[in-house]
């Protein structure tokens, strides 16, 4: 019986990245042998065990054979006669198919180290095409390692395109699609995930609301990049520099979905695209079972992001309506989330990446003024019921009106 460190831990150590978890493969052993040593079995479909002390995962070496549809349609064979090479052969990418022995010796039968040096994501074998989840995994690894210069091998790209065309992606459950997407949104370059999916045809299958933005023009004066799909990915890339939050990044991804509904005769203008996009956000989130808090922010950003661009022109009552709509009184964190997505929208344009976004500070200051009106004083004045709400609104409007007189005019987005 021999144990080997495998997968991400070996890959990340070779890339000089922090290793967060370790997975092991055990060659030449039976479940009974591991159980006798105190390991706890946790895998139902294939034999995976938890180490009695470290609680790290140890899996018996196994092979997999396609026996049905989708990413669950596999028959596993785990036995003492399965070799390390056979176990590594079933893995998705060569960079994930390297093992290290307890003595530190590397086993790399599929040239993963060479692909790490070349910064290439390459599938190990044609069995890659049997698991549709791997299309998403490759896109996620491309996003995760883009800053290191990794790209997808052309032959892997071709195989992913064939998989997208075959209809196999429809076997993926919404939960798995969202889980991979959520992981991708947390990476340093989340826009690469969606670009890789688009390059192989998977974006049209899994995210048609985003796919249809490509080829939709916006006015060149405001959008030198012209294409709304390109602008969407630029906005997501900019958001990744401003916030690590999945909610904010997903909202940025969805902010212009409504432009996909604009009839061609109205191009390149998209009047009312914000409210129109709310329904598409709802549709996308319902299909992928996106968590409610993530969905709620994305809907608000779709509806109000353009309003924030013109915040200094808003009347006091309109500012208060905006604060009410985003529920900032009870959820003050929403203010920063809305500002970050609007800033990313403004800066996610060719030639505007380094521009300041004074609308953010203006909106923060406006909220401080409105929130500074004392609710206790209104209640203490003896008013009852709805009269309290109306008086609070009146005082907030008055405070904002007086404050606005002292503010410099912000030039519009240019």
From Swiss-Prot:
One of its GO terms (molecular function) is CCA tRNA nucleotidyltransferase activity. Residues 228-329 form the HD domain. CTP binds at residues 8, 11, 91, 137, 140. Its EC number is 2.7.7.72, 3.1.3.-, 3.1.4.-. Mg(2+) binds at residues 21, 23. Gene3D superfamilies: Beta Polymerase, domain 2, cca-adding enzyme, domain 2. One of its GO terms (biological process) is RNA repair. Keywords: ATP-binding, Hydrolase, Magnesium, Metal-binding, Multifunctional enzyme, Nickel, Nucleotide-binding, Nucleotidyltransferase, RNA repair, RNA-binding, Transferase, tRNA processing. Transmembrane segments: none annotated. Comprises two domains: an N-terminal domain containing the nucleotidyltransferase activity and a C-terminal HD domain associated with both phosphodiesterase and phosphatase activities. Belongs to the tRNA nucleotidyltransferase/poly(A) polymerase family. Bacterial CCA-adding enzyme type 1 subfamily. Catalyzes the addition and repair of the essential 3'-terminal CCA sequence in tRNAs without using a nucleic acid template. Adds these three nucleotides in the order of C, C, and A to the tRNA nucleotide-73, using CTP and ATP as substrates and producing inorganic pyrophosphate. tRNA 3'-terminal CCA addition is required both for tRNA processing and repair. Also involved in tRNA surveillance by mediating tandem CCA addition to generate a CCACCA at the 3' terminus of unstable tRNAs. While stable tRNAs receive only 3'-terminal CCA, unstable tRNAs are marked with CCACCA and rapidly degraded. This is Multifunctional CCA protein. It comes from Yersinia enterocolitica serotype O:8 / biotype 1B (strain NCTC 13174 / 8081).
């Amino acid at each position: 019986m021999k144990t080997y460190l495998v997968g991400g831990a070996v890959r990340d150590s070779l890339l000089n990245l922090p290793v967060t978890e370790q997975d092991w493969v055990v060659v030449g052993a039976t479940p009974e042998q591991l159980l006798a040593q105190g390991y706890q079995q946790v895998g139902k479909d294939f034999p995976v065990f938890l180490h009695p002390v470290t609680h790290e995962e140890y899996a018996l070496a196994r092979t997999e054979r396609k026996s049905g549809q989708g990413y669950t349609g596999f028959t596993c064979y785990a036995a003492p006669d399965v070799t390390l090479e056979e176990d590594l052969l079933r893995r998705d990418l060569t960079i994930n198919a390297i093992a290290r022995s307890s003595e530190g010796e590397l086993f790399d039968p599929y040239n993963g180290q060479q692909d790490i040096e070349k910064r290439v994501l390459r599938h190990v074998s044609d069995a890659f095409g049997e698991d549709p989840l791997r299309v998403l995994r490759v896109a996620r690894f491309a996003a995760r390692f883009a800053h290191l210069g990794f790209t997808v091998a052309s032959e892997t790209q071709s195989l992913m395109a064939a998989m997208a065309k075959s209809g196999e992606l429809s076997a993926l459950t919404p939960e798995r699609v969202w889980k991979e997407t959520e992981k991708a949104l947390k990476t340093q370059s989340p826009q690469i995930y969606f670009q890789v999916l688009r390059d192989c045809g998977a974006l049209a299958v899994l995210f048609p609301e985003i796919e249809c933005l490509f080829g939709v023009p916006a006015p060149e004066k405001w959008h030198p990049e012209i294409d709304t799909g390109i602008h969407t990915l630029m906005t997501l890339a900019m958001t990744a520099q401003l916030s690590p939050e999945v909610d904010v990044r997903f909202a940025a991804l969805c902010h212009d979905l409504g432009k996909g509904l604009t009839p061609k005769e109205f191009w390149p203008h998209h009047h009312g695209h914000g409210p129109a996009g709310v329904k598409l956000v709802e549709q996308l989130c319902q299909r992928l079972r996106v968590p409610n808090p993530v969905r709620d922010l994305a809907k608000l950003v779709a509806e109000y992001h353009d309003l924030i661009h013109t915040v200094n022109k808003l009347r006091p009552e309109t500012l208060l309506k905006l604060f009410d709509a985003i529920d900032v009184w009870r959820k003050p964190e929403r203010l920063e989330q809305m500002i970050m997505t609007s800033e990313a929208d403004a800066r996610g344009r060719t030639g505007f990446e380094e521009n300041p976004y004074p609308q953010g500070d203006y909106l923060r200051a406006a909220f401080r003024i409105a929130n500074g009106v004392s609710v206790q004083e209104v209640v203490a004045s003896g008013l009852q019921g709805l009269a309290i709400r109306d008086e609070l609104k009146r005082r907030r409007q008055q405070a904002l009106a007086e404050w606005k007189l002292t503010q410099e005019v912000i030039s519009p987005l240019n």
